[in-house]
């Protein structure tokens, strides 16, 4: 990663953005090393004019996932686009990322299934590490990558509490919490989600970490309806 310097080609705003990235890298450095954290949010609209989230995924290579928060209508669209281009260029420069390892999306306010709608069909997955587990992420085909970075602490708690318990994961998405439960010694895991796509992804995550078999069930169903149908039939020690 490049050292902080003043770049005369940067606008004042771009230089502020660059300075903030450098500051955040310094601030996070020890925490990342101490926690063996490879995937993290580096920047989250710290400067209002540069309303983007910058997530870093480190494995054999480094990938950067930038999401622009959709600008309000009163913001000049041309200026917003110019600032976005600056943010992308500065991020690439500081993190030394080639163009093909940076992915850019616009995050609009969405509800229901729209937030999980497929954006592309490249089908390119990459393996990243978190908490001693491996997870497949996809930077191009969906708005989210398959691993919610802000759930890291919750996943770790699941792993710590799972030993000897039957674990139920509702709205399981790509099954990252299930992987933690299995790694933590859960007697069994049941992952329920309506999406076959995400359940298949969850299954691949489980296989990637060496888990499978009858004790690890993947159930495609509406979670609330599934709960009603199975009420009283099975008691889970961790949900």
PLM feature segments, named:
Residues 195-238:
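S-adenosyl-L-methionine
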Residues 100, 165, 187, 237-238:
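Conserved acidic residues
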Residues 149-165:
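Conserved alpha-helix/loop element of class I SAM-dependent methyltransferases that forms part
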Residues 188-193:
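Conserved SAM-binding motif I beta-strand of class I
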Residues 174-187:
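Conserved SAM-binding loop of SAM-dependent methyltransferases across substrates and taxa
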Residues 1-69:
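Non-catalytic accessory regions of SAM-dependent methyltransferases
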Residues 164-173:
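Conserved class I S-adenosyl-L-methionine
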Residues 53-55, 82-148, 156:
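Non-catalytic substrate-recognition/targeting regions of SAM-dependent transferases
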């Amino acid at each position: 990663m490049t050292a902080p310097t003043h770049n005369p080609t940067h606008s004042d705003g771009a230089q502020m953005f660059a300075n903030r990235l450098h500051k955040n890298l310094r601030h996070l450095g020890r925490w990342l090393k101490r926690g063996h954290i490879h995937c993290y949010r580096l920047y989250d609209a710290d400067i209002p004019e540069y309303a983007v989230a910058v997530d870093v995924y480190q494995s054999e290579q480094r990938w950067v996932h930038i999401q622009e928060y959709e600008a309000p209508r009163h913001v000049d669209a041309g200026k917003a686009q110019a600032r976005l281009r600056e943010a992308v260029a500065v991020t690439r420069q500081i993190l030394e990322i080639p163009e093909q390892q940076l992915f850019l999306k616009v995050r609009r306010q969405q509800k229901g299934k729209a937030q999980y709608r497929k954006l592309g069909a490249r089908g390119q997955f990459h393996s990243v590490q978190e908490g001693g587990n491996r997870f497949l992420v996809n930077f191009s085909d969906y708005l989210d990558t398959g691993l919610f970075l802000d759930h890291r602490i919750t996943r770790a708690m699941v792993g710590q509490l799972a030993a000897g318990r039957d674990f139920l994961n509702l709205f399981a998405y790509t099954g990252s919490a299930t992987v933690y439960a299995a790694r933590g010694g859960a007697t069994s895991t049941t992952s329920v989600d309506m999406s076959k796509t995400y359940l298949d992804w969850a299954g691949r995550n489980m296989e990637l970490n060496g888990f499978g078999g009858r004790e690890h069930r993947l159930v495609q169903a509406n979670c609330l309806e599934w709960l009603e149908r199975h009420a009283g039939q099975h008691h889970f020690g961790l949900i």
